[in-house]
Regions:
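C-terminal lobe/tail of nucleotide-utilizing enzymes
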Residues: 114-200
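P-loop/Walker-type NTP enzyme "switch/lid" segment
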Residues: 1-64, 159-171
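Glycine-rich phosphate-binding loop used to anchor ATP phosphates in small-molecule kinases
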Residues: 40, 63-80
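Conserved beta-strand segments of the P-loop GTPase G domain that flank and frequently precede/overlap
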Residues: 41-42, 93-96, 123-125
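Conserved nucleotide-binding/hydrolysis micro-motifs of P-loop NTPases
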Residues: 9, 44-46, 76, 98-100, ...
Length: 200
């Protein structure tokens, strides 16, 4: 809700749904700057326990209203995340070029493969020439080979994105990251989009 500038507009969230105070669809809020995007916010109480079964039930109830349902698990590795993500048709493994993040992504992907989930795609986020120039990584192929997941997109480090998410504003059309997001979305939809990588 914060990155969409809607933190003061959310009346119901996942916690409200789990408490039985409202139906899942009633807790869904339309994003102001994108008429085709809706969000169901995480519980305000960080200690709220959400099970994979509850997520599956909520998705089942609301799927007739939407073309796609995106489950954002946040960073970190735990069994809870694996159980929830197993409800998905496609897993997007997101990492930055940082070696620690790459290692975590590799561990997560390996666990998904062990559980029989082959439908994974890799997104490399916050990529800049600096990460390669400073030899933090040799190249993007090194990350792809380490994690072992097919690449679906690279998002360049973008000051416009940093400002937009901090203020809850939409990205300007010329923002490099917006171009990358659009290409990723089209690939998810099944379009044949060339994988072009523009790094600032």
């Amino acid at each position: 809700d914060i990155i969409f500038g809607m933190s003061n507009d959310i009346k119901q969230d996942l916690g409200t749904v789990l408490q039985g105070k409202c139906e899942p669809i009633d807790a869904v809020t339309q994003v102001k700057v994108a008429s085709n995007l809706n969000i169901l916010c995480a519980p305000k109480n960080p200690f709220t326990v959400v099970t994979a079964e509850q997520i599956a039930d909520i998705c089942q109830q609301v799927k007739k209203y939407f073309d796609y349902i995106i489950i954002d698990t946040g960073a970190g590795i735990n069994s809870h995340v694996f159980d929830i993500v197993e409800q998905s048709n496609l897993i997007l493994v997101v990492t930055t070029p940082d070696p620690i993040c790459v290692r975590d992504a590799q561990m997560m992907s390996d666990e998904f493969y062990k559980r029989g989930n082959q439908r994974q795609r890799l997104i490399i986020n916050k990529v800049s020439k600096r990460t390669i120039t400073n030899k933090i990584i040799r190249d993007l192929d090194e990350i792809i080979d380490t994690i072992g997941v097919q690449l679906i997109g690279v998002i360049p480090e973008d000051q416009e994105l940093f400002i937009a998410t901090g203020k809850g504003f939409p990205l300007p059309y010329e923002a490099p990251s917006l171009i990358a997001f659009d290409a990723i979305a089209r690939r998810i939809k099944g379009e044949d989009v060339p994988l072009t990588i523009k790094i600032n």
